[in-house]
Amino acid sequence: MADFKDNYIHYNWHWFWNWGTGEALNNGTHFVDILRWGLGVDYPTKVDSIGGRYRFQDDWQTPDTQLISFQFGDEASCSWEGRSCNSTPVDGFGVGTAFYGETGTLFISGGNEYKITDLQGKVIKDVKSNLKFETGNLLNPSEKLDAFHFENWFDAIRK
């Protein structure tokens, strides 16, 4: 049993090993699911992870920097990168999934937003979400991905 600390609640329990798994399974798992669905694969045959707590000197225990590689036999591979210590966008997105193909790239940032570019970076299609969100609000269920998770959960209950 662990002593009560106010830093464990409400959202911050993710960063302590007794209750959470860090960013990899907090938000990372949602984007890896999108990758798996897009690649048409189920479970990885090999997983490698490197990372640690390099930037912040606080009581959180899980990595603030992490890279996980997933191998799906000879079918496909993908990687997930978590940089809680540095929010510099990758390909213009703070979070999301990217499929790099032979003729272009598909970026999915969540919340019904995606962008398709050709190999030269020319935008072929750019779809923006009509969802309003506050990036600093960690508890509001109307935030990007959470809204869809709640909708799915309620749909499952109704069935």
Residue ranges and their predicted role:
Residues 1-159:
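Contiguous beta-strand/loop segments that form the cofactor/metal-binding neighborhood of enzyme cores
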